[in-house]
Amino acid sequence: MKAAGTDTMKNEIKYEKSELELMTTYQLREICRREKIMNGVIHPLDKEELIQSIMRYMGKRQDFFICDKKKEGEERVEEFLKKTRIVIKPCKELYCQSQILAYEGLSIEYYDGYTIPYKKELSGTNAFLMGSDMTLCAILNLKEHGGRQEKLYLTKAAELETRETQRKDYRIFCMGRQTSESLYHLYYGEHTILPEHIEVYSIPLIDFVVRKPVTLMLPMAIDFGSVNTTAGVYLDSAYFENVGEQAAVKNCRENEINYTAFEDGNGESMLLPSVIGVLAVEEEDYKLLFGYDAIRLANASYVDEGFCVFYDVKRWIGEYEKEEEIVDRQGRRRLVKRAEILRRFFLYIIRKTENRFKCRISQVHISSPVKQKHYFRRMFREILPEYMTDQETMLDEGMAVLYNTISNMLEQETLEENEEYEALIIDCGGGTTDLCSYRFRIQDRRAAYKIYMETAYENGDTDFGGNNLTYRIMQVLKIALVRAKGNQNVSSVKEILEYMDTDIYRFIDSHGVKAFYQYLEQEYQKAEETLPTRFADFERYNRSEYYKVKNNFYTLFNTAEQIKKLFYGKVGALEVTVTSEQKEQRENTVLLDKWKLSFWKGNSLTVEKMIPEVMMNYFEIELLLSGEIYGIVQKFMEELYHSGRIQDFSFIKLTGQSCKIDLFKDALKEFVPGRMIQFRKRANIDAADFELKMTCVDGALKYLRDRKYGLADIHLNNGKAVLPYRINAYTHNGKEVVLVDGFKDWDTAGTISRNMEDLILPLYLKNTDGEEHCRFQYVCRQEDFSQKSYEEIEAVYGSHILQKETDSIENGDVKFFVWAEQEEWGFQVVPVYCEMDELYLGKAEFFSFESDNWVNSFFDGKK
């Protein structure tokens, strides 16, 4: 044996779970004693608990894949393979496709279809594609996929280089796990003992081709959602003429929209969870995980072990300049700007798309939120400048959905030329719900359609989305578990639902949504005493208890999300069972990790291994969610209904994944005839259904295609938005003054006066029902003022500060001018002071309507 470097690695024994499961309880205790795992020595643990303890501290890292670029790593491996003695092991049953096609800077994935027959000793190892002159042409990984043991997939990381040789004679060296791990450590420059000779299987390859990726003509489209994000590209004939015959592109559709698929652990999904996890925080950099990988990171953590996962990151748009503290499992911390984290998230999606379609993306169209379109576009310009497309032609989410509808109606020939149509679109996503009105008409010209589109924001709820529905299910799940564990102080789920089983719509009309859920909220708070989930309350406790409670919340919330998908992702799922025991294969079962939940026992939080089985049925969930859904529909539709405006609309379209729940359509029928509602729900829909979520990507790509190919001359216009907020203040004698009224003339400045001192002006953000959301403070100091003439003030602020208003300011007083900024989704405060009949202008300050200070988050540790 020979050593690479001067030191040798400590020879640690690591254990695989499959090996431990074959051992007796006595053998497992002996391992704990030998490895000084005190938890397994002191406490009388059973076999399952002993395996859990050993895997936590001495579990073997399953795979040592070479999957990122390391300086001089390939050179070290190539030099070793050239110099060492290689023994070829005979194995006729191992073979591969005769040719492998790779693309510069792109990965090879399982969907590319390169495989070898399954051989257990090769699973989870590295393989080395060599030229006849022993040039290292590519480093590959051998992976299982989908739990099937029929074949192993050849994959390659995008960061690793590929090269051809002059002679078309290649072979793939496959080797056992121990040899593969040795070369892994050699590649990364770690001190390791290298063998004098290695044994490999040699699989011949006729050709290895490396090509340059095709650059797409049209931008890629991304729909960034609160819960899920989707992406797609339009692949024209030119793409198919230039790309190679990869297995991945054989399934692509020519001159059609193709979606980016993401691996979810069980297969592929067109939906990527908008979740970001922290894998490692190092001195020079940090590593993040995205989507399903981030969720797996949280699920894989031990119950009292730290993890850092960000959900609902779309809310960061409003304050993307802020910093977030990221923490890895080792407790290493770092402050990182939200903009940088979001940039990496979008780059991950772009890279996944490039790898999937063997292409290069030069431009990206990300549909902006309707109410924050200008703010979002500025953020996009800053974080992804290299992918910028023409911002003036970028669609917001509502426009994209509408254009998809128009395009489909043109194909079906159901639109009348020059007739003006009005549409109302309700977009209920994972975190927010928006209501927008649209007007459009078309003209069929000789060369192209001429399409006129106008949009106006009508209403919205920052605090309602699919997460609200998941949270309601989580509340019932938590109460059911607490009752099953013996806490009879909490009412049963049956008792709670019986209380709610009334004429729901009329009850909410009279008493509101909060009153409808009052009993549920009361019992949920009682359940906190047994099964805590408010991890923010544990920040002053020790680290172990904090993470136990944090695990409680995320375990229950993710389980509730699975339950929701089973009920509303499958027709006929009338009952769902939640259990920790994997018994016989039962349909509609959600497995709850028995090592994840901690209950109060006396003064300590104890992990419960025996989790009681809980059953939920469809009718209970319908009753539970009806109040939330009717409440949001009533909020949006009631004013339109009573004013008669609802009759002006040609159709009402429901979009967003949450809208596939029939309860939305039922609630809408209280205000409009059912035939006005465009509600897509197909028979035999399953959990992978994503049609409602894809309408935004479809519309954006059809819009980009029609503009690029001259099929349509499209004119976009933004109408005046309705702002669902009011800004109020109080005069010196306590009289309330409305400074900004979002449902009226909100772009005219409201004013309020004070006597000039170093003063603080409190401002109150209220919703249309008069409920206070947030308080702002404008701090006014004399040194911030500078003398200005009215003409100078007018040059800066125009009609927002009128001369008749400044003329009325008395000496010694300051008048505050407050007006809304639609494009920035916030409001400005500008003070003007008068002294000795001279005007002095103070500093302007902008406040965002929606900020972290008041917007409801289900992931802040207060649920």
Residue ranges and their predicted role:
Residues F65-H191, K485-Y505, Q678-D807:
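Acidic, glycine/GT-rich loop-and beta-edge segments that sit at the periphery of enzyme/chaperone cores
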Residues D68-S182, K250-V364, S368, K478, ...:
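Phosphate-binding loop and its immediate beta->loop->alpha context
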Residues T24, I349-Q363, V633-F651:
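Phosphate/pyrophosphate-binding loops at sites that engage ATP/ADP/AMP, CoA/4′-phosphopantetheine
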Residues S237-L271, R446-N459, R680-I685:
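Flexible phosphate/Mg2+-sensing switch loops adjacent to catalytic phosphate-binding sites
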Residues V209-N242, E305-C308, K314-R315, L410-E454, ...:
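Gly/Thr-rich phosphate-binding beta-strand-loop-beta motif of the actin/hexokinase/Hsp70
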Residues K2-D68:
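Basic helix-extension-helix modules of the SAP/HeH family
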Residues T192-M217, T393-I426, K693-L711:
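Conserved phosphate-binding catalytic cores of ATP/NTP-utilizing and phosphoryl-transfer enzymes
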Residues L342, T470-Q475, I479, K485, ...:
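Helical "lid/coupling" subdomains associated with nucleotide-phosphate turnover
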